A protein has these predicted regions:
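Viral structural modules
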Residues: 1-176
């Protein structure tokens, strides 16, 4: 005969991922001639629940290196860009995410592409991919068997004579 028990544990109760391609613009003090480089550093983010979705707030610093004055001088634009992304998270269970822990992972680091010069404005695209795991309480049912195998009991027939014999055979000066 068996019965079932429930174990309450933490597990991944929802997952999702999303690819983002966003357009941004920055202004330069002078009209750039050529874009020499674009890189992203200091990517920071955190996730939280909003309704049935997960929202990721984040920011990164973008550095755009450009030349100007007919490619005779260079300069770098440094700017912090903030973002707010909404990600739909799928769950096989009918659960409430409000008391859950949100784990955000970067599946593709933000990268800069398609950089164009429009007067003294530099337009560019940022691509990134984020993955979300929602960790919360869930229950696992396990089968527990009531029938246990009987343990075989061994009776040690140790007499006082046997114990005294063991004590006499022990050499206390074995290290010498």
């Amino acid at each position: 005969m068996s019965n079932y028990k429930e174990i309450v544990t933490k597990a991944v109760i929802g997952k999702g991922k999303k690819y983002f391609k966003n357009k941004y613009s920055v202004k330069s003090e002078v009209v750039p001639s050529t874009i020499l480089g674009c890189w992203i550093i200091n990517h920071k983010f955190k996730g939280y629940v909003q309704g049935d979705d997960v929202v990721v707030d984040g920011s990164f610093d973008i550095n755009i290196w450009y030349s100007y004055d007919n490619d005779t001088k260079t300069n770098v634009i440094n700017e912090t860009i903030k973002y707010n992304e909404l990600i739909n998270v799928k769950s096989k269970l009918d659960v409430d995410f409000n008391d859950s822990e949100i784990i955000v992972r970067v599946l593709k680091q933000p990268s800069c592409g398609n950089v164009q010069i429009n007067g003294n404005t530099i337009d560019f695209d940022i691509e990134k991919e984020l993955g979300i795991e929602v960790v919360g309480d869930t229950k696992v049912k396990i089968m527990v068997e009531d029938d246990e195998d009987k343990w075989e009991v061994f009776d040690d027939n140790v007499t006082d004579e046997t114990l005294e014999e063991i004590d006499n055979e022990v050499n206390e000066n074995f290290l010498e």
